[in-house]
């Protein structure tokens, strides 16, 4: 897996998938005018390709998650002030969480990229709630500056779509992509 994300690791561990975590050393930038979904897909592919250079065989799983609100892409916050601005922007609104997944089959020299979109609805947040949340430390390593699986869950009124996508890995989609490559995680082999 081309990621050091503890949330993605937890999800794969829960499914019993054996993997090696190798973070991709990559500048996750977006090009001017690039559509958010296409940008996330490109970054996921670049992560998979960067990590694949270190292996001769196997499958590489890479993902990139972004948050989009009012047309603005929110990645991981640079600092606490940036996190405050992001959460203030999300307050009382809905936004999209886009996770792009790339599976690179080194043996077949093929890559497959898909993405999942989940709409998340935030309640209105007070500045004090935002500051308290940021002081927990949870905001700093997550796209959009919140984690739906932790304290950030108190901000969420509802979601439309895949919960695991918001966590960082759309499990059902990953299952389908792996199954098409001959890897059935439901078998005990």
UniProtKB/Swiss-Prot annotation:
What is its cofactor?
a divalent metal cation
Kindly list the cysteine pairs connected by disulfide bridges. Answer: none
> Which residues are responsible for catalysis?
64
Question: Where in the sequence is the signal peptide annotated?
Answer: none
Q: Which reaction does it catalyse?
A: dTTP + H2O = dTMP + diphosphate + H(+); UTP + H2O = UMP + diphosphate + H(+)
From the UniProt record, which GO molecular function terms apply? dTTP diphosphatase activity; UTP diphosphatase activity
Q: Report the sequence similarity comment from the record.
A: Belongs to the Maf family. YhdE subfamily.
Tell me the protein's name.
Answer: dTTP/UTP pyrophosphatase
């Amino acid at each position: 897996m081309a990621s050091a994300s503890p949330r993605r690791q937890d999800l794969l561990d829960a499914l019993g998938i054996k993997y090696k975590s190798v973070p991709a050393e990559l500048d996750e930038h977006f090009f001017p005018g690039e559509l958010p979904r296409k940008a996330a897909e490109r970054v996921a592919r670049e992560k998979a390709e960067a990590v694949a250079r270190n292996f001769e065989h196997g499958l590489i799983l890479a993902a990139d998650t972004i948050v989009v609100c009012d047309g603005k892409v929110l990645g991981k916050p640079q600092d606490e002030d940036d996190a405050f601005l992001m959460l203030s922007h999300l307050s009382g609104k809905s936004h999209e969480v886009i996770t792009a997944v790339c599976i690179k089959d080194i043996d077949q020299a093929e890559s497959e990229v898909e993405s999942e979109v989940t709409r998340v609805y935030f309640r209105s947040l007070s500045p004090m709630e935002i500051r308290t949340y940021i002081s927990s430390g949870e905001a700093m390593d997550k796209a959009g500056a919140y984690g739906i699986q932790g304290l950030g869950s108190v901000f969420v009124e509802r979601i439309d779509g895949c919960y695991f996508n918001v966590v960082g890995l759309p499990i059902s989609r990953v299952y389908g992509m792996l199954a098409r490559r001959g890897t059935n995680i439901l078998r005990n082999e």
